[in-house]
Amino acid sequence: MKNNFNELNLNSNIILGLEKQGITVPTEIQSLVIPNVLENKDIIAEAYTGSGKTLAFVAPLFQKIDTSKRESQVLILAPTHELVIQITEQIKLLAKNSEVPVTSLSIIGEASIEKQIKKIKETKPHMVVGSAGRILD
């Protein structure tokens, strides 16, 4: 297991953003997942609640996004409305704390599909997070 985020090859802005959240040492799942995401590998991982799974995939995706392009580059599917909201909140927090201008939008079943489609077209978020059912809609 890696002892710090530098060893995982995350850029300094992302590491600073994590530190602002009080996260200075990667968890086991983060140590395993982050390098593989950076290498564009497909990943299936399982870990306990509170183990840092969300940041395990979100942090390296921040590094891969070309923020100069105003287009969607990442689609994240989550099984529940609550998890969609949680992931989106973590993306927004990391964007703020790291000063990496990644934008995101959540797509959920309890909101108007027409309004959500309009919002995607208008804002062109880098990351779209949604429940599988709503994304299929």
What kind of region is each of these model predictions?
Residues 1-46:
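Conserved pre-motif I regulatory segment
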Residues 5-6, 13-15, 33, 62-65, ...:
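Short hydrophobic/aromatic-rich motifs at helix boundaries and adjacent loops
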Residues 26-28, 35-36, 60, 78-81, ...:
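Proline-centered helix-kink/hinge sites
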Residues 16-20, 70-137:
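Conserved nucleic-acid-binding Ia/Ib motif block in the N-terminal RecA-like helicase ATPase lobe
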Residues 31-43, 53-69, 85, 89-95, ...:
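Walker A/P-loop NTP-binding motif
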Residues 47-51:
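The conserved Walker
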